[in-house]
Amino acid sequence: MTRHFLRDDDLSPAEQAEVLDLAVQLKRERWSERPLAGPQTVAVIFDKSSTRTRVSFAVGIADLGGVPLVISTANSQLGGKETASDTARVLERQVAAIVWRTYAQSGLEEMAAGTTVPVVNALSDDFHPCQILADLLTIREHRGDLAGQTLVFLGDGASNMAHSYLLGGVTAGMHVRIAAPAGYVPAAVVVADAERIAATTGGSVRILADPVEAVTGADVVITDTWVSMGREEEKAQRLAELGAYQVTTELMAHAVDDAIFLHCLPADREYEVAAEVIDGPQSVVWDEAENRLHAQKALLVWLLRQS
């Protein structure tokens, strides 16, 4: 049966652990898996510009023996004359998998429903599951077993990153806290899904307004840009409303002594995070960026095995 990865909870707890174990192997033995040898082609479609996503998928597909076919929607029929479903049916005749960085989650769902090859969400407005796999790998490397650890995300709790931390974190059995002001809280349906998963994994979900309360006793502190692509006109308002959630050395002092700091990048220093934090000893953002490669390779290997 074809498996897709559109949301973090498309993997069960056991499957998520299996992918992370495989990522550890591939980081240690980079060319130990070659499921795309032939070579086979993987379509990598971009509606949004990217550095880390484009490089990590292109390099990862090549590492697995394949050829990355990078497509811009500006230079294709997708989203214009052709539906996502029709595009998927064309691509499946020629590629082994489809990776899509886009806007609407519904487009990914339509594409997945219309194809027999795996579809991977490389980012949507609602979720960023590949990033969370990389982050979980990074946390595991630096802090050991994921279950029982407390992960805090501060800032825009309605963002794709916050949604994915909720789902991916509780799938791993973590205690996930989102610290955000009114108007920036996660979607209720995502919170409900996370709570349902947490009830089976031993994790938990808390949505808080106070950043100090949220960070107190945390093992992992995370933030993301306050002004995402396409929201530049909201910059002044967002900086004013989210200013109290900046990750500073003073805020990090409320976490456990050996807490780590993550940020998926690109970062706006002195907005969502102080320079002394992201460039300081608790920051693991460069390991996190590298781990996009290993986590995504593991995901592709796993999906191709299932399919």
Swiss-Prot record:
It holds the Pfam family OTCace_N. Coiled coil: none annotated. Its EC number is 2.1.3.3. Pathway: Amino-acid biosynthesis; L-arginine biosynthesis; L-arginine from L-ornithine and carbamoyl phosphate: step 1/3. Signal peptide: none annotated. Keywords: Amino-acid biosynthesis, Arginine biosynthesis, Cytoplasm, Transferase. It catalyses: carbamoyl phosphate + L-ornithine = L-citrulline + phosphate + H(+). GO terms for molecular function: amino acid binding; ornithine carbamoyltransferase activity. It is found in: Cytoplasm. GO terms for biological process: arginine biosynthetic process via ornithine; citrulline biosynthetic process; L-arginine biosynthetic process. Gene3D superfamilies: Aspartate/ornithine carbamoyltransferase (3.40.50.1370). Carbamoyl phosphate binds at residues 50-53, 77, 101, 128-131, 264-265, 292. Its main location: cytoplasm. One of its GO terms (cellular component) is cytoplasm. It is an enzyme of class 2 (transferase). L-ornithine binds at residues 160, 224, 228-229. Belongs to the aspartate/ornithine carbamoyltransferase superfamily. OTCase family. NCBIfam families: orni_carb_tr, PRK00779.1. Reversibly catalyzes the transfer of the carbamoyl group from carbamoyl phosphate (CP) to the N(epsilon) atom of ornithine (ORN) to produce L-citrulline. This is Ornithine carbamoyltransferase. It comes from Clavibacter sepedonicus. The gene is argF.
